[in-house]
């Protein structure tokens, strides 16, 4: 291999050349915008722990989507704040539930918008856990039919992609079988395959009113110390029928994103989660970082190997990319 002075790495770093040789690129098409749909409010409600982010009333969700489409953001993931909760999360699969109504409302106005729906029970249960609880334990197998039923109700409402996030063993298989049996063989599953029991979720739990009433989620979400375990989780999801795999969170787990990219050929999503968002926004508001840090964060996730990024920064970064 040639050396200096024959090789001068700075030759390709001239201002009018740099863009030609960028190995990772970011565009609005790569971004998925989260929307918190709340059927209990009539006006947008600021989320205290997520600066500049809001809960959106059901009646205004189509307007929120329209604003994003004007910025070339075409893909959305919906999280619901329902009007009622119970022990088993039955409002998750209610055909008149908040997500079901939101999907129908959006699709009626914007049929080409890509709607991903979060399939989990934590927002719909009184205890705030992601599965059925018996004697203080989250019961895996009894949860599976409920999340299967929930996924079908989302597909019936018009969801383009369903995204199970509860980290129940066998959840992808249960959803794939339920969708196929209901005639939705072509509905893709984006699995939260490697979802870590992270401290970076706290603002989301405020936003979605999904905080747990007892214990924690370390019995079903992944241990933050483990990397090889993530490969096992993803391999199982692939075998069960996942079409898209995901790593969550993103920034503290760039090593996992890279490992997944090198081992699996499926489309890979990464979730730039609420704590990552709030951390960066707080630093910007205090003058400790410039807004350019947002782009650097997102391009680092892309560079690590993610095809898609779920991010609360989508609208502000899309404006800069236009």
From Swiss-Prot:
Zn(2+) binds at residues 120, 122, 130. One of its GO terms (cellular component) is cytosol. GO terms for biological process: protoporphyrinogen IX biosynthetic process. It catalyses: 2 5-aminolevulinate = porphobilinogen + 2 H2O + H(+). InterPro entries: ALAD (IPR001731), ALAD_AS (IPR030656), Aldolase_TIM (IPR013785). The active site is at 195 (schiff-base intermediate with substrate), 248 (schiff-base intermediate with substrate). PROSITE patterns: D_ALA_DEHYDRATASE. SMART domains: ALAD (SM01004). It is an enzyme of class 4 (lyase). 5-aminolevulinate 2 binds at residues 274, 312. Its cofactor is Zn(2+). Mg(2+) binds at residue 233. Pathway: Porphyrin-containing compound metabolism; protoporphyrin-IX biosynthesis; coproporphyrinogen-III from 5-aminolevulinate: step 1/4. It comes from the Archaea. Its EC number is 4.2.1.24. Binds 1 zinc ion per monomer. GO terms for molecular function: porphobilinogen synthase activity; zinc ion binding. Belongs to the ALAD family. NCBIfam families: PRK09283.1. Catalyzes an early step in the biosynthesis of tetrapyrroles. Binds two molecules of 5-aminolevulinate per subunit, each at a distinct site, and catalyzes their condensation to form porphobilinogen. Homooctamer. This is Delta-aminolevulinic acid dehydratase. It comes from Archaeoglobus fulgidus (strain ATCC 49558 / DSM 4304 / JCM 9628 / NBRC 100126 / VC-16).
């Amino acid at each position: 291999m040639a050396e200096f002075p024959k090789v001068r790495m700075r030759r390709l770093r001239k201002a009018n050349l740099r863009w030609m040789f960028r190995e990772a690129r970011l565009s609005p098409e790569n971004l998925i915008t989260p929307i918190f749909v709340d059927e209990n409010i009539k006006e947008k409600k600021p989320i205290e722990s997520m600066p500049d982010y809001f809960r959106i009333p059901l009646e205004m969700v189509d307007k929120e989507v329209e604003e994003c489409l004007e910025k070339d953001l075409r893909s959305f993931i919906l999280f619901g704040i329902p009007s009622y909760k119970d022990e088993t999360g039955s409002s998750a699969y209610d055909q008149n539930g908040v997500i079901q109504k939101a999907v129908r409302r959006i699709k009626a106005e914007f049929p080409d918008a890509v709607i991903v729906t979060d399939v989990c029970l934590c927002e719909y249960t009184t205890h705030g856990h992601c599965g059925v609880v018996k004697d203080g334990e989250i019961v895996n197998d009894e949860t599976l039919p409920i999340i299967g039923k929930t996924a079908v109700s989302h597909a019936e409402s018009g969801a383009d992609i369903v995204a199970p996030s509860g980290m129940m063993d066998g959840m992808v298989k249960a959803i794939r079988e339920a969708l196929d049996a209901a005639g939705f063989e072509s509905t893709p599953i984006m699995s939260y395959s490697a979802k870590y029991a992270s401290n970076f979720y706290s603002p989301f739990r405020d936003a979605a009113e999904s905080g747990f009433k007892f214990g924690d989620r370390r019995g079903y979400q992944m241990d933050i110390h483990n990397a090889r375990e993530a490969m096992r989780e993803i391999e199982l999801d692939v075998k069960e029928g996942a079409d898209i795999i995901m790593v969550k969170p993103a920034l503290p787990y760039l090593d996992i994103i890279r490992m997944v990219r090198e081992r699996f050929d499926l489309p890979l999503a990464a979730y730039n989660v609420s704590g990552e968002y709030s951390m960066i926004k707080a630093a910007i508001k205090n003058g400790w970082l410039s807004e350019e840090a947002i782009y650097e964060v997102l391009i680092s996730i892309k560079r690590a190997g993610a095809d898609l990024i779920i991010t609360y920064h989508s609208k502000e970064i899309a404006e800069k990319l236009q």
